[in-house]
Amino acid sequence: MEGDVLSGFGDRHNMDGKLLQSFQKSFVDVQDILDQNRLLINEINQNHESKQPDNLGRNVGLIKELNNNIRRVASLYGDLSHSFARSVDASSEGESSGTLKSDGKANQKRFRSG
């Protein structure tokens, strides 16, 4: 029985590791998009300063790409927020449900009001 209780901790550690990897990948994706946006903004500014009709026309496409990237970043942050909230909910459910310690005694958490 004690092995069953302790094996749950290993599963939790693996789950936390996967969650952390997922968060890290999302943050890397966001940073890549933000870096791309910085390049787009620089090009848009250069085109604007040149005042050449072809460059100004190209800005239309660049601005659309910039807007799409902003939507992608907002979506990624929304997904991150949702995943984080879900993981916190799952974590708090596990902690408040009364688990067994490795010595077999119940582990009930008390919450103070206030």
Swiss-Prot record:
Organism of provenance: Arabidopsis thaliana
Domain of life: Eukaryota
GO cellular component, one term: nucleus
A GO MF label: protein homodimerization activity
Subunit description: Homodimer.
Subcellular location: Nucleus
InterPro entries: EARLY_FLOWERING_4, EARLY_FLOWERING_4_dom
Gene: EFL4
Compositional bias ranges of the Polar residues kind: 89-100
Induction of its expression: Follows a light-dependent circadian-regulated expression with a small peak in the evening, about 12 hours after dawn.
Major location category of this protein: nucleus
Region (Disordered): 87-114
Stated name of the protein: Protein ELF4-LIKE 4
Gene Ontology BP annotations: photoperiodism; positive regulation of circadian rhythm; rhythmic process
Keywords, sorted A to Z: Biological rhythms, Nucleus
Function, as annotated: Component of the central CCA1/LHY-TOC1 feedback loop in the circadian clock that promotes clock accuracy and is required for sustained rhythms in the absence of daily light/dark cycles.
Family: Belongs to the EARLY FLOWERING 4 family.
